[in-house]
């Protein structure tokens, strides 16, 4: 998609801070390597060294559209917010799965169980996805922060662009033809409920809310000419600004012109005939009947309204691709010279490589038992080799780069271990396991008197539970983080730890990437000498990094021998620590605690409690309310209020809060249904 005409504004970082510590050297070397044409570059950035800011300054140096990949939605949202603050005049977009809930279509042959696709789409995230693709086809100063969603099938960018509608003032456009065009690209006419992806008509005035906007476009006709174009507020109708030209992109990524659609229908019919003949020849009459009914229904929907449920399963025909070929993805919307940055690459790279087989194993059953045509197999994520072919130059960022990244870069990497704050890596103390719990309690009490927090990591769930009980008996405020706690509760637990509602967090795997806890001054690793996944070199370095954001950060490893993994982690931490101390001494830097970040968190909590629209504590308060004694009208009002709050939270990218509110709403609706069933409603 390099031949599309895009506006060409410059990337510009706007920040009160200048690159500091290792950042200037890292930015310069990364820029030099990319400018020399090196395809794969690794940034080995220690925890808390400002890798996100380095990425922003690198983008400013390179002046190229950039894809930034993160391992999950939460980290992607965090990165997008950071980059928006650093690049306020450029388009920083967010592209992740738009499902709040997703149950994929599946068939379990052993029990003859068909599971229909079931999902709940987050309207705001879908809007952000459309905004990402529309920005990529309109301008060059675009950064898209994405999860692995970017390797899943999407409509082709050429069809998406070709089916867009360009409006210009004084241009001759027949109003009724324009309305038909809007319907063709999946906009719905709704003169009452005016929402995203709809349009309304009042005489010679047509209002549209594009799929990627929060504002509406007003088109005023004078006869068959466009008299004026405005952006307006969708609720009040107030004019925001007048413009001379507007491009309206389709309301779905899966669009095709009439000729392409007609050809796709014929291709699907031809494939259906061949597949039915094959199934009948093999005596699979039930499967053949099942496939005929489903496909003919889908074809009728496509012919009548240009769309059907699960249309993505026919994407190969809609795109005009040969069998077995890779689908179009978000990567195809970028210009050819785009840059890719993979954050937490030691997690993200294996994710990319594993998506194809997981998807394929489910779909093979659907095809074999007559639920889908074989072409549905081509609606899939990219294979690793296909991903490699589509991305150009790539920067891998991680505190512990994986073997693949290091091999791809020839074993070379750019190092960023000096923190702008002057904080150094924690000291590591190896102690014997004999009497380790009493020693740990002594260390915890020393920290709690200074209002500092402690993380304790164990090897088994049973050990974590027993340790938590024992610490509670000894008067220590402690919580236990385990696999039964969902993501939202986990975020709440960590927030409570930061705010000092308790002092010690015990868990099995506390090394999760992006765990930012500046108040933690001690990380205790029990059974550090038991080799395995949880005590590998990478795991130990990640766990040690949790104490690297505190001035007095310390790590205690309880072990009776020093394993190879321990030795490497200790040596690497000591090497970084010596380098950091020498730098601080040379430049007269006194390590500063991250007080500002803590204040920001406290401020956000206080603000959210004060706001009536989205208080972070609402979900907790509601769950404690005795809703069974609440009048039905009041309960319905509460559900409506929480739904509004959920929408507000999602628009502000506060997905943890939105998810918590969603769960509360589901519980309240269940309560309401119970009342209706017994005649209280």
UniProtKB/Swiss-Prot annotation:
| A single MF term (Gene Ontology) | ATP binding
Q: What is this protein called?
A: UvrABC system protein B
Task: List where Polar residues composition bias occurs.
Answer: 607-616
Query: SMART domains of this UniProt entry?
Result: DEXDc, HELICc
Q: Which GO BP terms apply?
A: nucleotide-excision repair; SOS response
GO CC terms of this entry? cytoplasm; excinuclease repair complex
Task: List residues of the UVR domain.
Answer: 636-671
Where the record annotates domain Helicase ATP-binding, the positions are 32-419
Q: Which family does it belong to?
A: Belongs to the UvrB family.
Q: Which NCBIfam families does the entry link to?
A: PRK05298.1, uvrb
Domain (Helicase C-terminal) ranges:
436-602
Q: ATP-binding among the record's keywords?
A: yes
UniProt subunit comment: Forms a heterotetramer with UvrA during the search for lesions. Interacts with UvrC in an incision complex.
Q: Which HAMAP family match?
A: UvrB
The organism's place on the tree of life at top rank = Bacteria
Q: What's the name of its gene?
A: uvrB
Report the main location listed first in the record: cytoplasm
Region annotation (Disordered) maps to 607-626
- A Pfam family matched in the record: ResIII
The record lists ATP as bound by 45-52
**What's in the keyword line of the UniProt record?**
ATP-binding, Cytoplasm, DNA damage, DNA excision, DNA repair, Excision nuclease, Nucleotide-binding, SOS response
Q: Where is motif Beta-hairpin found?
A: 98-121
Domain remarks: The beta-hairpin motif is involved in DNA binding.
Q: What does this protein do?
A: The UvrABC repair system catalyzes the recognition and processing of DNA lesions. A damage recognition complex composed of 2 UvrA and 2 UvrB subunits scans DNA for abnormalities. Upon binding of the UvrA(2)B(2) complex to a putative damaged site, the DNA wraps around one UvrB monomer. DNA wrap is dependent on ATP binding by UvrB and probably causes local melting of the DNA helix, facilitating insertion of UvrB beta-hairpin between the DNA strands. Then UvrB probes one DNA strand for the presence of a lesion.
Q: Where located?
A: Cytoplasm
